[in-house]
Amino acid sequence: AESQQYRDFFCGVDDTMAGQTAAKAFIDHFPDGATIVEVGGQAGHDAQIKRHDGFVTGIEGSKITLLDSQNCSGWVTADAMAIMEDFIVKYGDKIQGVFCHWDNGATGIIEALKNAGMNDVYLVAVDGCRAGYDQVKAGTQSVSIGQSFTNMAIQSLKCAQAKLAGQTFEAVNFIPLDVVTKENVETLPYPEW
């Protein structure tokens, strides 16, 4: 959305909002507070920065304590698993929750938690891809903050039609995020990716 001078419109997600939505999931689940860790995406990537910033501002003033945060060198599942293994060694049972910047990274975190026998950790990740939906269905991931590409495409077509017809339209269109849980995963369209 920052490079608006290069396009007629933007239809996509607000990664800051994704971080804030993840923070709200933790606050809602742990009203009395909790200690959590964050496994970030590719260090320096726009989505990583905004998801982290949204998350940190989202938990500010709450009873959620961020024990540690570490970014990956890339959006690599094995990197997320290695970081989580290090967090487990360092913090052990103090970890009540994990915020991961992407669902496929959560796959590695789930494996690390399973190997450590830590079955009651509340795991929230972003993307809403097949891995996230499947992990939520299986109960190994608590929440997936879903990006609806269907809704992005629909809004993009509406903007393109308005542009071609000479009508006015919003230049920046942030698409609402889906909070995917075990309770609602079956009611949402299964992702193509």
At which residue positions do the language-model features occur?
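A residue-level marker of the well-folded mature domains of exported/periplasmic proteins
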Residues: 1-193
